[in-house]
From Swiss-Prot:
SUPFAM superfamilies: YheA/YmcA-like
Entries under Pfam families matching the protein: Com_YlbF (PF06133)
UniProt name for this protein: UPF0342 protein LCABL_19440
Top-rank lineage group of the source organism: Bacteria
Organism field: Lacticaseibacillus casei (strain BL23)
Family: Belongs to the UPF0342 family.
Length: 114
């Protein structure tokens, strides 16, 4: 019987060699060179994390929190290194979605009686 954890670890290593992953890594490295863009990116990540924590605790977001996150997102949309990173994230996400479909297929087959 195959050890699925070994297979998963190999897949993780293989993902690092894909063009999509390499493009994302390069885009992130370039983003870090722009201190203003990287600072905004870090602020956005922190706010997202804080809101996710509140959500997990069943707490509602204040209008100010939502507005602050939206304003920060709006600022980020105009910054080229962030736009580039987001585009590369989409490419990697598409690949990950395709992999998830492949991995999930046996479960789908069970429920479809295959």
């Amino acid at each position: 019987m195959a050890n699925v954890y070994d297979t998963a670890n190999q897949m993780a290593a293989d993902i690092k060699t894909t063009q999509e992953f390499q493009d994302l890594k390069k885009a992130f490295d370039l983003l870090k060179l722009d201190t203003v863009a990287y600072g905004l990116f870090q602020q956005f990540q922190q706010k997202q994390y804080e809101m996710q924590q509140k959500s997990m605790q069943g707490q509602d977001f204040t209008d100010d929190e939502v507005k602050s996150l939206q304003e920060l997102g709006d600022k980020m949309r105009d910054i080229q290194p962030i736009q580039n990173l987001m585009a590369k994230e989409q490419g990697l996400s598409q690949m990950m979605d395709e992999l998830n479909k492949i991995i999930s297929q046996p479960i789908i087959d069970v429920y479809q009686g295959k």
